[in-house]
């Protein structure tokens, strides 16, 4: 049996501890040995990132250099059109074959918006969803049919993620750090310290490049 792999996508503008630490805790909780961290090139739901694709990629390489859990995925950086998660996960499934257990990691805020995503209802055909819980967000979807969808696929057993190739939603009790890329960009613009918010080598690179000023 192939071991469970997970994909963790985002803009990472810049990458910070709020991205990395909850996923590291998640990996320990559910026995996950490989996470592909995949930056968007052209995010469909957000404005263009301030840092270039090459700069965001390099910051990720610095951040995960001493973390064997993480592998950098460049699939979406190689695409100049908007990166839709459903398309990315479908292509990943085709590469890995029908039996490999695959998961996509999102935050609880993203789960609540999930029905607005492009082809959201196909995503569980190709992967599991692992949701990092966040305090202050409701546990229920806003519409009854979406709540029914959540309950239909919900599992409380991490073993299901390893034993089945796709189709389950798991709510993980991970630590929530009050850190956001927006906060970091604002503090850097004001010249305030960000030493405790992101890896030192990433911060050094940001300063060398004059990013977010």
Swiss-Prot record:
It comes from the Bacteria. One of its GO terms (molecular function) is ATP binding. The keyword NAD applies. Pathway: Cofactor biosynthesis; NAD(+) biosynthesis; deamido-NAD(+) from nicotinate D-ribonucleotide: step 1/1. Keywords: ATP-binding, NAD, Nucleotide-binding, Nucleotidyltransferase, Pyridine nucleotide biosynthesis, Transferase. It holds the Pfam family CTP_transf_like. InterPro entries: Cyt_trans-like, NadD/NMNAT, Rossmann-like_a/b/a_fold. Coiled coil: none annotated. Signal peptide: none annotated. It catalyses: nicotinate beta-D-ribonucleotide + ATP + H(+) = deamido-NAD(+) + diphosphate. Transmembrane segments: none annotated. Its EC number is 2.7.7.18. It is an enzyme of class 2 (transferase). The keyword Transmembrane helix does not apply. GO terms for biological process: NAD biosynthetic process. Catalyzes the reversible adenylation of nicotinate mononucleotide (NaMN) to nicotinic acid adenine dinucleotide (NaAD). Belongs to the NadD family. This is Nicotinate-nucleotide adenylyltransferase. It comes from Salmonella typhi. The gene is nadD.
